[in-house]
């Protein structure tokens, strides 16, 4: 079966933004204008089709990235039909993992900014993630009808806060309640959308007289940006002082795809203005799968390889989301980078080294689905029947194995103990947590060996609240949760030599293992390193693996307070063995003893997670907010003026941030907002370390 739409006409885009920049409403309007959803769903009344999990509708925030396929031929039907796959991404800071994994499989992104608050803290976080994956972006300044709306102000913030180069492609006509339409700077025409038919109809008119000069000034800047794309355009621009419409679009497209500029658009999704022109811009300026560099991977023998976006290369895809569906079981969302996959055919999961069979392939529309026979390079689809595949795995042709670049997931920073309300639900809770952990790699489940409690860990309080909530809704398991626990770490400050000796003689065959280590601190974030410096066989080669494993296990279990020990180098420099009594277990135990002995002399310290906190507050509460942050051992790093008052940035230990949202609301009568992201691990002050160690020794 041949392709219906050539790959050049595909666009895989994400819509990313801070909470309340109107991202879900923008997506809804896109679905409406592309003819997929007939009644526009409003986030205000919990009806948006992209927000398809019940909690999202209640909380009015978007949690899971749903993938949707739509088609568009332009506002004036000026293009052949293009296929747009939209991945909706959450804007709440506890769900950055969702954003991270959707960015991984996108070719381009539309970033929504609020016309009043502009670049907010989460916009910066998401922007940095998009930089990491080299995703081309364009901006949509939404909510132009709100009091305080200012398009050019937001452009300036994109320069100042994100260090990017925005290029306005439109200017708004009016703002706040007088916002009526936009000026298209390429065509130099005003566009007005009719309110009666929800913006389905529009008119092109002359630019209002009082705006002509401003539009000419900004058009000049836009043409100049386009000319910088290549020498040919620059020569023509220098000779003639202008470029044709086609040349402007070609130049802007090239620079946008090369991540040099951010074309900027504006509108009000809620008032049905500007979204249709934004869709045209997606087709004109966002890359097709064939425009982005080939994806890199590794073959079985470790050699580097790449896969191009074409049906002729072997099949290779990345699973970027796993979900449990009550009717069909496990759904695996995947992006195909090369080749073709037919329903019912076998695939190879090269990360898990397992063959699997794809039962059915579904094309997803945010909450309805259509079954398809095959899926081709550049497409995003959903597989039913994959049992062992989790987020970030590569699926490929069993005869042409490859591992695509892996996704990186952050370590959780907060843990809570959880137990079912009734003993009968114990098994059900285990199954539910296992399924939720398969869906979300930033959520972990483990059993505490000493207390036998189930511990769940995640990226923030809201993240874990929603997990508990989903267990109740989707799996009918009600749970009690304990107080949140911080994920501390341990490390050392100086190098020492230490030995570990395990000898047991109790009649018959004994046990004997003896190692000498040099234990040294490493740079923050560099992890564990094991060096084997044995010469002359003081420890036989077959036991080296057991020594490394024993050392690593002891470090993971911690030494001073039971927290994982990080950034340590362990060098095996000497040891001894017994011809009869030595075995792997004895050396593993000896290694653990060596680590314990060494660490206690190596100035061990406890590290605590420190969060980057940003509070936006009306000016009159600034003193109270700063005072409260100082009481929480916070270090205020900056205070900036913003449209709604002040923005305060601070670094605060996570252990001091529990219950912060309630305290902040009471200090500011609910008028302040904050966001919090993990920043780094720092040495905890000595009094705090003593408390933590005392608690650990009591077994609390």
Curated annotation (Swiss-Prot):
GO terms of molecular function: GTP binding; GTPase activity; guanosine tetraphosphate binding; translation elongation factor activity
One GO term of the biological process aspect: ribosome disassembly
Localization in the cell: Cytoplasm
UniProt keyword annotations, A-Z: Cytoplasm, Elongation factor, GTP-binding, Nucleotide-binding, Protein biosynthesis
Keyword Nucleotide-binding belongs to the record: yes
InterPro entries with a match to the protein in the record: EFG_II, EFG_III, EFG_III/V, EFG_IV, EFG_V, EFG_V-like, EFTu-like_2, G_TR_CS
GO CC annotations, alphabetized: cytoplasm
Binding site for GTP: 17-24, 88-92, 142-145
Chain ranges of the tr-type G domain: 8-290
Keyword hit for Acetylation: no
Family indicated by similarity: Belongs to the TRAFAC class translation factor GTPase superfamily. Classic translation factor GTPase family. EF-G/EF-2 subfamily.
Biological function: Catalyzes the GTP-dependent ribosomal translocation step during translation elongation. During this step, the ribosome changes from the pre-translocational (PRE) to the post-translocational (POST) state as the newly formed A-site-bound peptidyl-tRNA and P-site-bound deacylated tRNA move to the P and E sites, respectively. Catalyzes the coordinated movement of the two tRNA molecules, the mRNA and conformational changes in the ribosome.
Name this polypeptide is given: Elongation factor G
Gene name in the database record: fusA
């Amino acid at each position: 079966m041949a392709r219906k739409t050539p790959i050049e006409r595909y666009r895989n885009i994400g819509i990313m933004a801070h909470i309340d920049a109107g991202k879900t409403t923008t997506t809804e309007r896109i679905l409406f204008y592309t003819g997929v959803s007939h009644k526009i769903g409003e986030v205000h009344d919990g009806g948006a089709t992209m927000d398809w999990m019940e909690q999202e509708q209640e909380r009015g925030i978007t949690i899971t990235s749903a993938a949707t396929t739509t088609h568009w031929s332009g506002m004036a039907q000026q293009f052949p039909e293009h296929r747009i796959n939209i991945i909706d991404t959450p804007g709440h800071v506890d769900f950055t993992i969702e954003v991270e994994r959707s960015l991984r499989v996108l070719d381009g992104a539309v970033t929504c900014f609020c016309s009043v608050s502009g670049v907010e803290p989460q916009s910066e976080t998401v922007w940095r993630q998009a930089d990491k994956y080299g995703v081309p972006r364009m901006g949509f300044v939404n909510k132009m009808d709100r009091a305080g709306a200012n398009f050019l102000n937001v452009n300036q913030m994109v320069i100042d806060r994100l260090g990017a180069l925005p290029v306005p492609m439109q200017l708004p006509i009016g703002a706040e309640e007088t916002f009526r339409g936009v000026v298209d700077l390429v065509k130099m025409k005003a566009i007005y959308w009719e309110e009666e038919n929800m913006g389905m109809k529009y008119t092109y008119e002359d630019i209002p007289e009082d705006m002509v000069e401003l539009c000419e000034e900004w058009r000049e800047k836009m043409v100049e940006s386009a000319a910088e794309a290549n020498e040919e355009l620059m020569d023509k621009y220098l000779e003639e002082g202008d470029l044709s419409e086609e040349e402007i679009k070609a130049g802007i497209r090239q620079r946008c795809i090369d991540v040099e500029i951010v074309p900027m658009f504006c509108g009000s999704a809620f008032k049905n203005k500007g979204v249709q022109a934004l869709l045209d811009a997606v087709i004109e300026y966002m890359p097709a799968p064939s425009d982005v560099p080939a994806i890199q991977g590794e073959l079985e023998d470790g050699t580097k390889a790449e896969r191009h976006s074409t049906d002729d290369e072997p099949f290779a895809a990345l699973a970027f989301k796993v979900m449990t569906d009550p009717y069909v079981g496990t759904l695996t969302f995947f992006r195909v980078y090369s080749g073709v996959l037919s329903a019912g055919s076998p695939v190879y999961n090269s990360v898990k080294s397992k063959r699997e069979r794809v039962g059915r392939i579904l094309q997803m529309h945010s909450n309805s689905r259509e079954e398809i026979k095959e899926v081709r390079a550049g497409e995003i689809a959903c597989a039913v029947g994959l049992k062992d595949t989790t987020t970030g795995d590569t699926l490929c042709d069993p005869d042409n194995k490859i591992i695509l670049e892996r996704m990186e997931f952050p370590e959780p920073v907060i843990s809570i103990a959880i137990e079912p309300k009734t003993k009968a639900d114990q098994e059900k809770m285990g199954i539910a947590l296992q399924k939720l952990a398969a869906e979300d790699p930033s959520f972990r489940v483990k059993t505490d060996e000493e207390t036998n409690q189930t511990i769940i860990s995640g990226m923030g309080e809201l993240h874990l609240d929603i997990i508990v909530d989903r267990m109740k809704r989707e799996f009918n398991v009600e749970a009690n949760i304990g107080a949140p626990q911080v994920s501390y770490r341990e490390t050392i400050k100086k190098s020492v030599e230490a030995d570990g000796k395990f000898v047991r003689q109790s009649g018959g065959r004994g046990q004997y293992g003896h190692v000498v280590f040099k234990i040294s601190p490493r740079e923050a974030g560099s992890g564990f390193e094991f060096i084997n410096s044995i010469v002359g066989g003081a420890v036989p080669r077959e036991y080296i693996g057991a020594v490394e494993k024993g050392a690593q296990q002891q470090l993971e279990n911690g030494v001073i307070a039971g927290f994982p020990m990080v950034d340590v180098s362990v060098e095996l420099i000497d040891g001894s063995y017994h011809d009869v009594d030595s075995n792997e277990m004895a050396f593993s135990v000896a290694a653990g003893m060596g680590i314990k002995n060494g660490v206690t002399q190596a100035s061990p310290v406890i590290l605590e997670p420190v969060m980057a906190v940003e509070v936006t507050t009306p000016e009159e509460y600034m003193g109270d907010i700063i005072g409260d942050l100082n009481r929480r051992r916070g270090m205020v790093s900056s205070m900036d003026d913003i449209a709604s008052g002040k923005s305060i940035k601070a670094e605060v230990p996570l252990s001091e941030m529990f219950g912060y949202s309630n305290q902040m609301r009471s200090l500011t009568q609910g008028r302040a907002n904050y966001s919090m992201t993990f920043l780094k691990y720092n040495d905890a002050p000595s009094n705090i370390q003593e408390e933590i160690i005392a608690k650990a020794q009591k077994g609390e």
